[in-house]
Amino acid sequence: HAGQIQGFFDIPVDNLFSTPIFARHARKKIKSKKIICVAPDVGGTERARALGKLLNVGLAIVDKRRPKPGQSQVMNVIGDVQNQTCIIVDDIIDSGGTIVNAAKALKARGAKEVYVYITHGVLSGDAVKKIKNSVIKNLVITDTIDNVEKTKNVKNIEVLSISGLMGEAMKRISNS
């Protein structure tokens, strides 16, 4: 969730990033030439910038507020998303409110399509239903949390395996 977490352990910890896996997937999946990476909030700017750098595309940021816990309200979109294919990237999706609201705001500002890449899909409550009924063309989550049953009949949710990343990390640790 945050690189700083490594400081709380008394043993070596490797923080693994799904960004290269997301970039590889996006290059295959998204055919548009007009792409922009989007942070769903100011806190996710570095994550979106990292994916944008790998894809060689620009950056936009959704400025949101939380009027109450569990609720998010989009205030503004920083960056030009008009006629762009937007790729939102985040670390965790729980209730889905932030991502669904961000996607809706991007479409309202002229985005052609909205793709979403999330490392950890908690998908609590009615999150799957929110995503299924949203403007999101495709939401990709990794398999760090088992969501096969929750997502198996949802056309716009895809689960991407990070077993290769985990296996490579373990191999490198055991060989060092």
Indicate residue ranges for each PLM-predicted region.
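PRPP-associated nucleotide enzymes
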Residues: 1-176
